[in-house]
């Protein structure tokens, strides 16, 4: 509801969107909160045109769902302590690490994964987010 119309939303205010979510939760209706409230707006703000064109229409239509890939066995949700690394290899990144307590993993299409991309800066910096298909080889 609160997404801009150009991205498939209704252009409603934040208050109207919160009321909608409150009512959705009150009646127990499923809603992809992470995808709608975190992933979509982040892509709107920071994504490339290609990412916007690929992800946002599918999210707005309720056809694409993300799980969250932040927590790690030795760090919990302390993102500054991330050990998972993403190293550029040509036009791609190779990601190595371990995630745990992956919220919303059942039935998701992508992992919204945080990984360290720059180990040479303070630990609360040098972290990037990746949209990784859940069926990527190596994900178990």
Where are each of the predicted segments found?
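A short, Trp-centered hydrophobic/proline-enriched beta-strand micro-motif
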Residues: 62-70
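A short core secondary-structure module
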Residues: 92, 96-140
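Internal helix-loop-helix
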Residues: 1-62, 104-110
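Short, solvent-exposed loop/turn elements at beta->coil junctions and helix N-caps
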Residues: 6-8, 71-75, 100-101
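A structural signal for short hydrophobic beta-strand segments in well-ordered beta-sheet cores
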Residues: 84-87
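Short, ligand-facing micro-motifs at secondary-structure edges
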Residues: 28-29, 79, 139-140
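Active-site-adjacent elements of ketosynthase-type condensing enzymes
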Residues: 74-82
